[in-house]
């Protein structure tokens, strides 16, 4: 599951439908990607990061890896 993305989406009060529309995909398709059943395409990750004005790694890298990378 994309926990960082889910948390960010909820903090910014966006729905799955909002992000599906942003990516020009179905809400069900987006939901499956957020659940980790399908992978986000590279361009979709960049679109989402740009939309939220966040670093792509902060959204899509696993939290453990992101923390380890910051301390290096």
Regions inferred by a protein language model and the residue ranges of each:
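Recognition helix of helix-turn-helix/homeodomain-like DNA-binding domains
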Residues: 25-39
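DNA major-groove recognition helix of helix-turn-helix
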Residues: 34, 44, 52
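Basic Lys/Arg-rich amphipathic helical interaction modules
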Residues: 1-3, 72
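Short basic helix-loop element that most often maps to the first helix and adjoining turn
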Residues: 3-22
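Short, basic-rich loop-to-helix N-cap that marks the start of a DNA-contacting helix
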Residues: 37-47
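Short, charged recognition helix plus adjacent turn
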Residues: 8-13, 50, 58-72
């Amino acid at each position: 599951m994309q926990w960082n993305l889910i948390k960010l989406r909820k903090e910014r009060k966006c729905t799955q439908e909002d992000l599906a529309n942003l990516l020009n995909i179905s809400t069900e398709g987006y939901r499956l990607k957020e659940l980790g059943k399908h992978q986000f395409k590279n361009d979709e990750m960049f679109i989402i990061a740009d939309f939220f004005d966040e670093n792509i790694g902060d959204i899509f890298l696993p939290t453990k890896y992101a923390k380890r990378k910051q301390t290096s």
